[in-house]
């Protein structure tokens, strides 16, 4: 185990990524001989310029679970195109019983979002956004709903290409 911990500390990636822990849960497996305790961690990683990833890790110790979550988040990153530090347009996301509504905001508004959504926007590099979550506040479902909504977002050039029009026609 000491070898694993020294490996974790020596391989701390310095890739300019921002990391945020969302949740750490203690989980229990009941067996014939008693209870086996473990930990489940949920984390998000972003580059501050629109790339974001979510990961979850499980282990008998918290630091190992957190490390696994961070590594998975780095592997599963998606790219979201931002517009001057905010979103392109209003977007909604849903996962399970969690629903989120995300609206672009003017300069100086800040990040108006709660819980896991705030952490996502901070690591992603969004500086002005208004977000509201309804339904379940389970952190895992809220993160998945937020990422699903962000993945659905389109730039004006993508919409113009789909419709076979110019960007000027789309923007009016």
From Swiss-Prot:
UniProt GO cellular component terms: small ribosomal subunit
PROSITE patterns referenced in this protein's UniProt entry, alphabetically: RIBOSOMAL_S5, S5_DSRBD
InterPro entries, A to Z: Ribosomal_Su5_D2-typ_SF (IPR020568), Ribosomal_uS5 (IPR000851), Ribosomal_uS5_bac-type (IPR005712), Ribosomal_uS5_C (IPR005324), Ribosomal_uS5_N (IPR013810), Ribosomal_uS5_N_CS (IPR018192), Ribsml_uS5_D2-typ_fold_subgr (IPR014721)
GO molecular function: rRNA binding; structural constituent of ribosome
Keyword RNA-binding included in the entry's annotation: yes
The entry's keywords: Ribonucleoprotein, Ribosomal protein, RNA-binding, rRNA-binding
Alphabetical list of SUPFAM superfamilies matching this protein: dsRNA-binding domain-like (SSF54768), Ribosomal protein S5 domain 2-like (SSF54211)
Entry-linked HAMAP family: Ribosomal_uS5_B
Free-text comment about domains: The N-terminal domain interacts with the head of the 30S subunit; the C-terminal domain interacts with the body and contacts protein S4. The interaction surface between S4 and S5 is involved in control of translational fidelity.
Subunit (UniProt): Part of the 30S ribosomal subunit. Contacts proteins S4 and S8.
Function: With S4 and S12 plays an important role in translational accuracy. Located at the back of the 30S subunit body where it stabilizes the conformation of the head with respect to the body.
Name used for this protein in its record: Small ribosomal subunit protein uS5
Source organism: Herminiimonas arsenicoxydans
Lineage, uppermost ranks: Bacteria, Pseudomonadati, Pseudomonadota, Betaproteobacteria, Burkholderiales
Gene that this sequence comes from: rpsE
């Amino acid at each position: 185990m000491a070898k694993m911990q020294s490996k974790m500390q020596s391989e701390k990636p310095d890739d300019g990524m921002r990391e945020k822990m969302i949740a750490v849960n203690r989980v229990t497996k009941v067996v014939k001989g008693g209870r086996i305790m473990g930990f489940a961690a949920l984390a998000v990683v972003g580059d501050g310029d629109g790339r974001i990833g979510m990961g979850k890790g499980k282990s008998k110790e918290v630091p190992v679970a957190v490390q696994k979550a961070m590594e998975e988040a780095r592997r599963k990153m998606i790219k979201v195109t931002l517009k001057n530090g905010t979103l392109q347009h209003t977007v909604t996301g849903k996962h399970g019983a969690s629903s989120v509504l995300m609206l672009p905001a003017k300069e100086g508004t800040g990040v108006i979002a709660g819980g896991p959504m705030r952490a996502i926007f901070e690591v992603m590099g969004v500086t002005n956004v208004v977000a509201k979550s309804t339904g379940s506040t389970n952190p895992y479902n809220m993160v998945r709903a937020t990422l699903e909504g962000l993945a659905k977002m389109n730039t004006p050039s993508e919409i113009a290409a789909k419709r076979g029009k110019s960007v000027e026609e789309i923007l009016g």
